[in-house]
Amino acid sequence: MRLPAVVLLAAISTALAGGVTVKTLVSPTETSNSYVEMVPVKPRTLRAFTLCMRVASKLKGEREVNLFAYRTRDSDELKVRRELDGRLSFYLSGVPALFEVPPLGALETHLCITCDSKSGAATLFMDGSKSMTKIYKKGHALRSGGRVIIRQGPDPHLGKFDAKQSFVGEMHDVNMWDSVLSASTIRDIYSGDRGPRGNVFRLIHRRAQSHRSSGHRPPHPPPSSSPSSSP
């Protein structure tokens, strides 16, 4: 009989009532009912952001992989994923920005995405190296009042998680900022130098919730309060 899949919050994780202090998220198997959820440090509407994480995955071949999803009650505001053809992408409420980069693998990769609403400039960094800049969703803003789901991506049509798109591997140092970090700052973070902590989300320094959903239904954030603009 196959044992149920579990999300392991490992690497010197400390159990706490109602949550865990997360160092590394270890996802050993495909699953449609396990995920990690984070709430923002301070809810805010984002007109610019930087999202970084360290990822290692044993998944190969033609397979979609959900890495990160920021979801409000009404929509998926931001999704980061690996596409079937191996390209990395992020979605802002719709059509993706696609980046042709070396594939993710068992060796740890430092991955960062930056996006500026005013100019529309969107960039991906992999291990400190910068991609070509794309112009994407100029004028678009991420709404406040949502939550982050890691290792899963709710299907807007089926209303549940798909095990065949779940993340399998290790992830840590998930941080998000309300500004576009400079290329030199991102390279410093990749190199392990002390850099700014994420002021929107930070998995390694915050308490995060690990869940198993018996009904396989994705979570819905509570109704959002009045949004406030980021500085």
Show which residues each predicted segment covers.
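Extracellular glycan-associated modules
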Residues: 2-231
